[in-house]
Amino acid sequence: AAQAEKADQSALDALAAEVAKKATTAALEAVRAAVTKLVVGSYTGNGSCGQSHPRTLDFTATLGRPPKFVAVRSKDGDHRCLFLIPGMTNSNNHLSDSYIMDTKNTVTWSGNRVSWYADSDSGQMNRLDSNYVYFAIG
């Protein structure tokens, strides 16, 4: 009987250790999901534009979830900036405090990706060989 109790206690101890390990893993995953992340990146424009050539940023590897806010800015002196927020289907470039004409971008969100396109490469933030930086919060 003592040997059976000892075996039962060993099994209970092993089960308790496994439960504690899973609880710790679950708590860690909950913290990871709750912590806001900031991602900074850059790209070089390829000159394409329009619906068949959208610019896409994928945050799967960097944020691991959809971004809550994305800002894209030209580094090449024209000071254009594009702001993207989930749920937006359109966004326009801005220059300092001014709206820039003919820069309407159609925006789509899919999983951890955001894509946009405009009728011009500069409006789409994709001018050939121009440098762009972005940051995303997620």
Regions found by a protein language model. Give the residues of each.
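Extracellular attachment/recognition segments
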Residues: 56-117, 124
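A generic structural signal for short, non-catalytic loop/turn and secondary-structure boundary residues
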Residues: 33-36, 109, 129
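Intrinsically disordered, low-complexity segments enriched in small/polar residues
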Residues: 41, 97, 115, 130-132
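Alpha-helical structural elements
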Residues: 38, 104, 127-129
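Extracellular receptor-binding modules and their adjoining Ser/Thr/Gly/Asp/Asn-rich linkers
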Residues: 31-78, 134-138
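Short, structured beta-strand segments at or near domain termini in extracellular proteins/domains
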Residues: 120-138
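Fibrous stalk/shaft segments of extracellular and virion attachment machinery
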Residues: 1-40, 49
